UniProtKB/Swiss-Prot annotation:
Residue sites binding Mg(2+) 2 per the record: 67
UniProt keyword Methyltransferase, yes or no: no
Protein name, entry field: Crossover junction endodeoxyribonuclease RuvC
Gene designation per UniProt: ruvC
Main localization (coarse): cytoplasm
Biological process terms in GO annotation: DNA recombination; DNA repair
Family, as annotated: Belongs to the RuvC family.
Length: 182
């Protein structure tokens, strides 16, 4: 399974692509889309949209994983981040990719083992898990971590989806805190 992970941002959007076969992970590509701050908001969103479309065309992922927007103390920042995330979602929908969303806590826990990991810890674990020669840039590392999170959690979710169909629990059933919730 090839996973495209995205760490959305209006100034810098990180992307990372990995191949996952069982617990084996292989690095494919990563980078950061740097959006010129002088552009008007619609043009900035278009830069994100166009670049992520190109990444999807070039790397041909099977699925995408996206970090869920956090609530910031500044509502305007949260809204702007949400718009960048919307541009990313449009690019993924245009590329006909299934999108799975994870919180920063879930991503850190899947990659480092604790949801309170520092950025440097995430970068170090991404480097180790993917056998990279150097430490990935922060935005790329976050996107790769999102992809790794899906590689670890996605197959379990798929199996639980089959379980929910067999047990009649419904499609909205998820795992939260080690328990099935509806």
């Amino acid at each position: 399974m090839r996973v495209l992970g995205i760490d959305p941002g209006l100034r810098r959007t990180g992307f990372g692509v990995i191949d996952a076969e069982g617990m084996r992970l292989r690095y494919v590509a990563s980078g950061t889309i740097v959006v010129p701050p002088a552009l008007a908001l619609p043009e900035r969103l278009k830069v994100i949209l166009d670049n992520l479309r190109q990444v999807a065309r070039d790397t041909r992922p099977d699925v995408a994983a996206l970090e869920i927007v956090f609530l910031n103390t500044n509502p305007a920042s949260t809204l702007l981040l949400g718009q960048a995330r919307g541009a990313a979602l449009c690019a993924l929908a245009d590329s006909q990719l299934a999108v799975h969303e994870y919180t920063a806590l879930q991503i850190k826990k899947a990659v480092v083992g604790t949801g309170r990991a520092a950025k440097e810890q995430v970068q170090m674990m991404v480097q180790r898990l993917l056998s990279l020669d150097g430490t990935p840039a922060p935005d790329s590392a976050d996107a790769l971590a999102c992809a790794i999170c899906h590689a670890h959690v996605g197959p379990l979710q798929a199996r639980l989806g089959g379980l929910s169909a067999a047990t009649g629990l419904g499609g909205g059933t998820r795992v939260r805190g080690g328990r099935l919730v509806g």
